[in-house]
Every structure is written in structure tokens, then in C-alpha cells.
Amino acid sequence: SDINSPADLKGKAAAVQPKGNTGEAITAHMLQSQGLTYDDLPRVNHGSYTDAVSLMKDGNAEFFTLGTTVPAGAVMDLASARDIKIVPIEGEHLAKMQELNPGYKQIVIPAGSYPGQDADVNTIGYATHIIARCSLDADVVYNLLKALNEYVPDLSAIAKAVGNATPETMGRDIGVPLHDGA
């Protein structure tokens, strides 16, 4: 593929998540950071990860984007059938995206996460939040967070990134008030 950075996406057929999905919003920001919109792409297919993998396998999409944990089943599926290239988002590309959303941060997809990926790849990451209505009973919120904290080792077996969660990181200021039960 001749896609080596976000700057190379103009004129390429895309497979992205449904409108309003986090991955789709990040894709729109990635394009916007390069002065592009979906109108600069010949085809944009909004669908599931499974749809995106099928489009890539069939040659009907030249790139797909997703916001998920590593390793991702969809990427593993594609990599089992086709050679893949994970396009880095770093340096000026990351900085432009952070202008659009300061919550984006640099993360690394470790070498060997996917078949044929022999080097670390820098990309963007973001935090996931649990949002509760203010009127939710404080005991319910407390017990939910207590259980989440207690089962971090079990949860990290499903989503490795959860393994870094601690009461301190869970309670980090994200710019909105924490619930009374938190």
C-alpha cells in the first residue's frame, strides 16, 4: 500500500464505523487534521469491523480505522488473510489531532501484536470513561467502582489496557465533576 501516514489518505476508499461511533469520530478528526473530509475519498463505507475486514479482503476499501484494544480481533482476521500495514499517527499528525481534541495521546502498538508487524507503531489512544446520571444512588456508583477495581486483573485478561487501572487513575480529573459515589 502507498498509505504511509494520514497525509496519504486523499483519494483512498475507506471503511469506517457507523456515524457517531468513537472510531468514526476519530477518523473524521484524522481526515480534518490533514485538511480533508469524507468528500475527498471516492468511497466511504460506514459499518461494523466485520464489514470493514470484508471490504479490505475484497479490495473494496484501501484502509479501515478502528478504536479498540490491542490486539483487535478484526485486525487479526485481516492479517490472517492479507499482508497489513499499521499506519503510524505521530509527530505533526498527532499534534494536529490534539489541536482538535486534547484528549488524544500517543500510545504504542507493540511489535508482534499482529502477524507481520515486526516493529512498534506509534498511534493515538484515548481514555474511556464511565458516565452516570447525577441522581444515580451514590452507593450504586461506589459499589460498581469498587467491583471494577477489585476485578482489574480479571478484566485485564479481556482488555489488557485495563490492567493499568488503579483507584488513582480511575479518579483522575477529566474536566467534569466526579459523581458523589466515586
Where does each model-flagged region fall?
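An extracytoplasmic/periplasmic, membrane-proximal ligand-sensing/linker region
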Residues: D51, D58, T68-I86, K96-G103, ...
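Structural recognition of the beta-strand scaffold that forms the well-ordered cores
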Residues: V16, F63-G67, V87
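A bilobed periplasmic-binding-protein/Venus flytrap-type ligand-binding module shared by bacterial periplasmic
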Residues: S1-I3, M97, N101, P115-A119, ...
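Bilobed "Venus flytrap"/periplasmic-binding protein-like clamshell domains
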Residues: S1-D58, V152-S156, R172-G181
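Non-catalytic interaction surface on structured domains
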Residues: A7-K10, V87-L100, I107
